[in-house]
Amino acid sequence: MTDTTISIRKAIDADLTAIVAMLADDALGSTREDNSSPLNQCYTDAFKAIDSDPNQLLTVVEHDGKVVGCLQLSFIPGLSRKGMWRGQIESVRITSDIRGGGIGRQMIEWAIAQCRERGCGLVQLTTDKSRADAMRFYKSLGFVDSHEGMKLSL
């Protein structure tokens, strides 16, 4: 891909099928997501909750009129660090046919700018330990692996 002109916008419900397809399009996502048609109601319910929360922003990335990426930003208030707000970047995906073309970098730089505009003092994200390429990518953008994350499935 030579032209990496993109537009980033707030996701709408019509984008859900494309978003879920991207979430399911890797080794980990294929085991966690339900990319069946019609779309599972759980995604519609989650979208409504995200869309109605002013501290959540689900976005899509368009290139040549097609949705090719997505990410979710959460703006998190906190008491530590003198009441500092944090930006949490999650669900970063790019369609497999255009990965490596610079769009991911543009997406993350845009997300960081959004966090700055909202007054966040830091931006954080997590990625699965098995995603070595993602780790290298985030480090190239200045992220450091300063903390050890833990999860408990419920």
Language model features: what each stretch is:
Residues 108, 115-126:
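Conserved GNAT acetyl-CoA-binding A-motif
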Residues 90-94, 100-113, 140:
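Conserved acetyl-CoA-binding loop-helix of GNAT-fold acetyltransferases
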Residues 24-46:
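Conserved GNAT-fold acetyl-CoA-binding loop/helix
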